[in-house]
């Protein structure tokens, strides 16, 4: 046969009769044939003299089980796997504790299966070696099970269960002759089937010789017997009790225990009394069945009595002094009852065996943890040399080394704790922070968590560490976005209750934290602490890009966004980004065709009416827009703090302690507010002086040409972040500052202030040389620049004609235009016309001369 040829095999299944060897193509035909052998299939070990055999018994060819109908046999055959069925892969072998059968040497991994298997050997021995004798009236069946037929009584069975009201009702049986008795060897009860009279079914109860506990089935009895022994003792002792049968009494008459003839067994102990099972109404004076339990052994220490010497010995161990160790493992317990409770874990099904020492464990995790003890080096080793088998204890030990200074030991720690004494007031005072604690435990906890800098709670998301677990749980809400605490006034939600309480102060207006230097109040203690840095010039937060210092961390964070040009809040419609979320929400109103809600005092826009109501405008003040005026120069400011700062910065030479605001807050000198007097910071390039370091740093960018704030839209850079903020409104088209008189809007507040002076006619900026006044400071600065140029020209008369520098014209328009507003013209009364003027320094595009206002000085 070549390799290319295919071989087809036809397999035909046939069923062979186990009695005569005939073959049949189907199981149904084989079952019908076996009906002829039904009489021959009757097993003599189950046949009792005088009892007719059952008809139509069908035996399973796999396990030999007898069934009554073919349908039952077919249903039973489905439980056996066929040969063509794919075998499941075997589980990997693991260390298990097996139970060995002493008869056939079979191994079982479950105690229940082992007990059930041992019971099968007991049945075979009972049937093969014992005599089967039937008694119809007064005789006894000597097969290991007693058969009793009571007189005609109600069909009830009374069990000795401890509950006198517990009983089981069974239907009465008829249609069977009085001599036909069926004994069911697979159960612990017998069936009396009599004809013409009712017969009660009585259960055979099994009594433990050690603890006098009762059981209904041999399996439960044998399993319980195994709990009184361990190891080989359990198996050997169980063998001695397998063939013993419980003792029953018929009509109150005690019987001797019946032992199977074929087995060599030991008798029950003398104190093992018989169980009395009687029908109801048989003995009126007895309300319930009792079992004689006479304590014969007493303890000499506590006079407690016991039924067996084993119980007495176990009890006497409890009077000994601990510790007690487990005989199966190395665990130690302070009392013996705890050892007994621990031994129950070893009696359970421990299937995980240690190959090194032979100890068994319930779970694989416990076994792996135990096997670390057999390693040469333990798994968890600390830097100080200590080793741990348990990870939890190792982590707890590492807390000792978490502080900056190493721990010197438990002895020194106890000395430190003992040396702490309460103050005369009864409190424990903390020197670093000044807090008082009523209890020593609270004081030590404060020292450990606050001043030891021990942060052992780590966030799994960002890796940040916290001192307390509650702080970590609050921090985790920032990653999930959950805000479970909401304000009942404005419906704002917060991720912690502390933030909610701080927010409520904005509704009540309460500011409990007040600065002692300037009188300014704050709602949070941290804000007051940061404010005090201003007085002491303590700017702790420095920008690494430009070197500007800030006294608040969030100011530095907002400042750093200007360097990168990437703002955190981006519009999804047009792609513009914003520094604040409020600005983004106001911008998105324009996409929806809605108008923002604007504050009339300061011109700030808000996305909702509620946000506008929550806004407390500093320009409005408590007096409806009234400002505080400086008594020295007349400048108006919005608050006491601004007035004190202004006086200290601008008028440090005039030390006026009587300058006060409407609230009577005294103005402190400059040296008390900021630790120094006047403008003591000088620029090394131009020798200009400044009052703050921030102002000096911003000024020095003029000399260095540094522009650290680029525009993310066009790339243009600026020296200050405020200039960038104003510039970005050109891209967005936003003009939040609107004139109340004419309705004209501007991008910055300065332009609006200059525009309002047109309506009022106010010219606050005057020239000190000629006395001319201007509406804006920029126009005054440009005007004074001309005076400086005139002085230069007077020093060099030959460079310019003398008659060309006598008059100056200032061009002013209603709207600001990008032109140079100063020109030089000929004196008045000259014959030269306006058209002959030479505009050398004036750049005008698409502007007629009629729109230019020409004036003379």
Swiss-Prot record:
Signal peptide: none annotated. A zinc finger (C2H2-type) spans 15-37, 58-80, 99-121, 206-228, 297-319, 324-346, 352-374, 380-401, 428-451, 457-479, 485-507, 513-535, 541-563, 569-591, 597-619, 628-651, 681-703, 709-731, 737-759, 765-787. Keywords: DNA-binding, Metal-binding, Nucleus, Repeat, Transcription, Transcription regulation, Zinc, Zinc-finger. It holds the Pfam family zf-C2H2_6. GO terms for molecular function: DNA binding; zinc ion binding. It comes from the Eukaryota. It is found in: Nucleus. InterPro entries: Znf_C2H2_sf, Znf_C2H2_type. Residues 651-663 have a biased composition (Polar residues). Residues 648-678 are annotated as: Disordered. GO terms for cellular component: nucleus. Transmembrane segments: none annotated. May be involved in transcriptional regulation. PANTHER family: ZINC FINGER PROTEIN, ZINC FINGER PROTEIN 574. Belongs to the krueppel C2H2-type zinc-finger protein family. This is Zinc finger protein 574. The lineage of its organism: Eukaryota, Metazoa, Chordata, Craniata, Vertebrata. The gene is znf574.
């Amino acid at each position: 046969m070549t390799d290319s040829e295919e071989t087809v095999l036809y397999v035909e299944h046939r069923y062979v009769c186990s009695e005569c060897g005939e073959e049949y193509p189907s199981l149904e035909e084989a079952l019908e044939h076996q009906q002829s052998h039904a009489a021959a299939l009757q097993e003599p070990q189950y046949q009792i003299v005088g009892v007719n055999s059952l008809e139509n018994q069908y035996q399973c060819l796999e396990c030999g089980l007898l069934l009554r109908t073919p349908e039952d046999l077919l249903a039973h055959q489905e439980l056996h796997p066929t040969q063509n069925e794919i075998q499941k892969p075997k589980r990997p072998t693991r260390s298990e504790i097996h139970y060995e059968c002493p008869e056939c040497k079979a191994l079982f991994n479950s105690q229940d299966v082992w007990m059930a298997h041992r019971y099968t050997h007991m049945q075979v021995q009972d049937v093969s070696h014992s005599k089967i004798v039937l008694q119809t009236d007064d005789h006894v069946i000597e097969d290991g099970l007693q058969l009793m037929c009571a007189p005609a009584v109600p069909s009830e069975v009374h069990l000795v269960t401890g509950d006198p009201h517990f009983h089981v009702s069974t239907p009465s049986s008829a249609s069977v002759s009085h001599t036909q008795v069926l004994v069911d060897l697979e159960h612990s009860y017998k069936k009396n089937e009599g004809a013409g009279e009712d017969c009660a079914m009585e259960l055979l109860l099994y009594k433990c010789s050690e603890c006098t506990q009762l059981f209904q089935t041999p399996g439960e009895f044998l399993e319980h017997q195994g709990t009184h022994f361990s190891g080989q003792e359990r198996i050997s002792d169980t063998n001695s009790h397998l063939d013993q049968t419980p003792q029953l009494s018929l009509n109150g008459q005690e019987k001797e225990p019946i032992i199977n003839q074929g087995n060599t067994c030991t008798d029950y102990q003398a104190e093992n009394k018989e169980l009395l099972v009687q029908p109801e109404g048989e003995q009126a004076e007895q309300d319930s069945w009792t079992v004689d339990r006479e304590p014969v052994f007493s303890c000499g220490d506590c006079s407690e009595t016991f039924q067996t010497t084993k119980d007495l010995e176990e009890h006497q161990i409890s009077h000994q002094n601990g510790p007690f160790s487990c005989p199966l493992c190395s665990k130690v317990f302070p009392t013996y009852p705890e050892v007994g409770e621990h031994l129950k874990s070893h009696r359970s099904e421990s299937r995980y065996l240690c190959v090194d020492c032979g100890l068994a464990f319930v779970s694989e995790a416990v076994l792996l943890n135990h096997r670390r003890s057999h390693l040469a080096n333990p798994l968890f080793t600390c830097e100080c040399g200590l080793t741990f088998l348990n990870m939890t204890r190792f982590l707890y030990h590492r807390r000792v080394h978490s502080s900056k200074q190493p721990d010197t030991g438990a002895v020194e720690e106890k000395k430190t704790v003992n040396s702490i004494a309460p103050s005369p007031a009864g409190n424990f005072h903390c020197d670093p922070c000044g807090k008082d604690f009523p209890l020593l435990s609270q004081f030590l906890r404060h020292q450990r968590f606050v001043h030891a800098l021990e942060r052992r709670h780590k966030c799994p998301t960002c890796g940040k560490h916290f001192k307390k677990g509650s702080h970590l749980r609050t921090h985790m809400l920032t990653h999930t976005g959950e805000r479970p605490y909401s304000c009942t006034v404005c419906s704002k939600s917060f991720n912690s209750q502390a933030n909610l309480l701080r927010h409520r102060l904005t509704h009540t207006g309460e500011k409990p934290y007040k600065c002692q230097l300037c009188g300014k109040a704050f709602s949070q203690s941290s804000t007051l602490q940061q404010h005090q840095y201003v007085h002491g010039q303590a700017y702790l937060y420095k920008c690494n890009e430009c070197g500007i210092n800030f006294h608040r961390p969030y100011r530095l964070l907002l400042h750093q966004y200007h360097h990168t040009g990437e703002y955190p809040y981006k519009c999804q419609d047009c792609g513009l980004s914003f520094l604040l979320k409020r600005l983004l929400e106001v911008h998105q109103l324009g996409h929806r065709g809605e108008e923002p809600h604007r504050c009339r005092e300061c011109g700030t826009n808000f996305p909702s009416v509620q946000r506008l109501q929550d806004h407390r405008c500093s320009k409005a003040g408590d007096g409806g827009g009234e400002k505080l005026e400086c008594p020295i120069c007349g400048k108006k400011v919005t608050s006491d703090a601004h007035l004190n700062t202004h006086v200290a910065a601008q008028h440090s030479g005039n030390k006026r302690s009587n300058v006060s605001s409407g609230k009577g807050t005294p103005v402190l000198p400059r040296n008390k507010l900021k630790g120094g007097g006047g403008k003591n910071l000088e620029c090394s390039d131009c020798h200009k002086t400044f009052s703050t370091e921030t102002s000096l740093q911003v000024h020095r960018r003029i000399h260095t040409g540094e522009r650290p704030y680029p525009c993310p839209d066009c790339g243009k850079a600026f020296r200050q972040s405020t200039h960038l903020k104003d510039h970005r409104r050109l891209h967005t088209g936003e003009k939040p500052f609107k004139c109340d008189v004419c309705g004209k809007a501007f991008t910055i507040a300065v332009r609006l202030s200059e525009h309002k002076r047109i309506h009022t006619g106010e010219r606050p900026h005057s020239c000190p040389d000629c006395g001319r006044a201007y509406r804006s400071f920029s126009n005054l600065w440009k005007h004074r620049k001309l005076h400086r140029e005139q002085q230069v020209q007077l020093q060099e008369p030959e460079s310019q004609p003398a008659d060309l520098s006598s008059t100056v014209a200032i061009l002013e328009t209603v709207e600001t235009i990008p032109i140079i507003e100063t020109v030089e013209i000929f004196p008045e009364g000259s014959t030269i016309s306006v058209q002959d003027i030479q505009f050398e320094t004036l750049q005008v595009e698409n502007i007629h001369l009629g729109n230019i206002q020409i004036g003379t000085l």
